[in-house]
């Protein structure tokens, strides 16, 4: 929903523009296929790429109102293992614990047994919207659903460590091609979009010198 909304608004702003959007976790895709830009969470150490921060990767625990209404158990640290969980499977993530920050103290919580385990985030998000269970999600990716009341944050006083994904959203492009005006425009648009939602970072003034 997040990327679809960004692209729809950007295309409305520039009607003559054509976009090709591919969804992949492979950072090498941009080097191998000639893509102009990729969006990446966390550090990017792939040789030959330039990375620009465009947003903050804040993580939250979310659920649908329907799930919360059908489950009388409280959503707190003591009852987490009794809930239905939707869990994202990724080789970069810790398979045993989540790390939370609570009042400046780092807390580790052992993973519960998931009701659904998947390597596809969109599939898990669809199940969260359908009321199947709790989901740990990047807040920028679920903000439209939070705004619409389709999802709500639970345990908001707990800050989740973004783990191996890092605390920034990066716009990444090949150094040998530099960035075209279209790529510049999209990065600035994306940064403004995220800033409007409280998850953006200002594009540096030096950006225009590239």
Question: Where are the model-predicted features located?
Answer:
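Residues that form or flank phosphate/diphosphate-binding pockets in enzymes
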Residues: 1-2, 71, 95, 181
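Central regulatory/effector-binding core of bacterial HTH transcription factors
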Residues: 1-47, 203-210
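A generic structural signal for alpha->beta connector loops
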Residues: 16-18, 48, 82, 148-151
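Acidic, Gly/Pro-rich loop/turn segments at junctions of secondary structure
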Residues: 22-118
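Hydrophobic hinge/microswitch elements
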Residues: 108-153, 158, 162, 171-173, ...
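C-terminal effector-binding regulatory domain of bacterial HTH transcription factors
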Residues: 148, 158-210
